[in-house]
Amino acid sequence: MEPSSKKLTGRLMLAVGGAVLGSLQFGYNTGVINAPQKVIEEFYNQTWVHRYGESILPTTLTTLWSLSVAIFSVGGMIGSFSVGLFVNRFGRRNSMLMMNLLAFVSAVLMGFSKLGKSFEMLILGRFIIGVYCGLTTGFVPMYVGEVSPTALRGALGTLHQLGIVVGILIAQVFGLDSIMGNKDLWPLLLSIIFIPALLQCIVLPFCPESPRFLLINRNEENRAKSVLKKLRGTADVTHDLQEMKEESRQMMREKKVTILELFRSPAYRQPILIAVVLQLSQQLSGINAVFYYSTSIFEKAGVQQPVYATIGSGIVNTAFTVVSLFVVERAGRRTLHLIGLAGMAGCAILMTIALALLEQLPWMSYLSIVAIFGFVAFFEVGPGPIPWFIVAELFSQGPRPAAIAVAGFSNWTSNFIVGMCFQYVEQLCGPYVFIIFTVLLVLFFIFTYFKVPETKGRTFDEIASGFRQGGASQSDKTPEELFHPLGADSQV
């Protein structure tokens, strides 16, 4: 591997930084709706009274609020499934740039919903920003993976998740009643998303297009070479160009890859299964359930302002994403994912014990707080960041957009299902709901151990070749045989 491949140049930092502004938007819009729930519900009631001369029924209010929250995921499902329509036609960078129009429209709708006395404007704004975020979850990991050198691909790929958790943390802080989570400023809280959108519109024109897109999709070798020189900070980019040309030759031998082809072809069936299961391991891990439980647990523990403790968990969230950023290229993706899943399973068991004994032993609430922080920390070590960028690593240039669309759709759909069903399952199971997540985490651990290869330090073509060599027979190999061509046996 060339020394230049480990260099973090200014142009590379600008490109990745410009892209992850979209990740920040995703995180912010995920977390922003929770804090101002009561004041927005009051706005819904006032609007209803203004229109119909009577207070809104509690059931209608609950339905409207649930729709306001869930419509974001519906938009995300549609957006994530549409990734391939844009990236191959307009390019990776230009697609990110164009999508900011959705953020501006959403900001206007939500920002003026109170003035217009229209909760429909708010709900439509949530849907539109959901579409934007669904597209972002495909665009950002793809672009970052394609501009990054092999030696830095995992670390820079983790920045997508870091952007998400920082966005959530900002939303939690801005959502405090003393800042913007009050009856006067909540429209600004929801519409402030125009600022990162505007910033991205300013930054992205100075960022290069993906060199892989230029060479492999557009056959513009000179432009790709020029971009690579700027990204790598060196005049000698022969190694990168040769790798891309080899991938391009391989792509020309393959027919156009559709979403159905991903599941039909033996060469793609294994990696798409891995991609989907890793996305499910993120959303079905119970992380959303933990955040759901956290406020009530902090209250039972005697925390005077549970919202500040929730922000504390957001800080833990961010801190351990940074830890993952620094160790992912040393420890490897597979190892960190396994550690994260195992740690989360242990914390889920602790949480179940603590919640079950909370009434008899009040001090158990402190154990549950430790379990919450531990659960969040282990999530950000593996299942949080890794599923996002490993999907881009598992596929060559041809099938990558379709694969990212399928993986993103799986993530958003499972997110939607958990959001809609968790409260009913929790009412049925009580504190024992975490037993369900423990079982799922163990199953995901087993799958990861036997099926997921290590991609650390390997080029896209080497990873794809590993799957092609195995073909349909890979599932019959031992973990050692499966991981060998992909470098899992290399020294940490």
From Swiss-Prot:
Any one GO MF annotation of this record: fucose transmembrane transporter activity
Binding residue positions for D-glucose: Q282, Q283, N288, N317, E380
Stretches of the chain found on the membrane's Extracellular side: 34-66, 113-120, 177-185, 294-306, 356-365, 423-429
Effect of G340C: Strongly decreases glucose transport
Protein location: Cell membrane; Melanosome; Photoreceptor inner segment
CDD domains tied to this protein: MFS_GLUT_Class1
Phenotype when changing E243V: In EIG12; decreased glucose transport
N-acetylmethionine sites (modified residues): M1
Chain residues that bind cytochalasin B: T137, Q282, W388, N411
PROSITE patterns, alphabetized: MFS (PS50850), SUGAR_TRANSPORT_1 (PS00216), SUGAR_TRANSPORT_2 (PS00217)
Activity regulation statement: The uptake of glucose is inhibited by cytochalasin B and Phe-amide core-scaffold inhibitors GLUT-i1 and GLUT-i2. These inhibitors bind in the central cavity of the inward-open state and overlap the glucose-binding site. Glucose uptake is increased in response to phorbol ester 12-O-tetradecanoylphorbol-13-acetate (TPA) treatment: TPA-induced glucose uptake requires phosphorylation at Ser-226. Interacts with SMIM43; the interaction may promote SLC2A1-mediated glucose transport to meet the energy needs of mesendoderm differentiation.
Main function: Facilitative glucose transporter, which is responsible for constitutive or basal glucose uptake. Has a very broad substrate specificity; can transport a wide range of aldoses including both pentoses and hexoses. Most important energy carrier of the brain: present at the blood-brain barrier and assures the energy-independent, facilitative transport of glucose into the brain. In association with BSG and NXNL1, promotes retinal cone survival by increasing glucose uptake into photoreceptors. Required for mesendoderm differentiation.
Protein name: Solute carrier family 2, facilitated glucose transporter member 1
Species of the source: Homo sapiens (Human)
Taxonomic placement: Eukaryota, Metazoa, Chordata, Craniata, Vertebrata
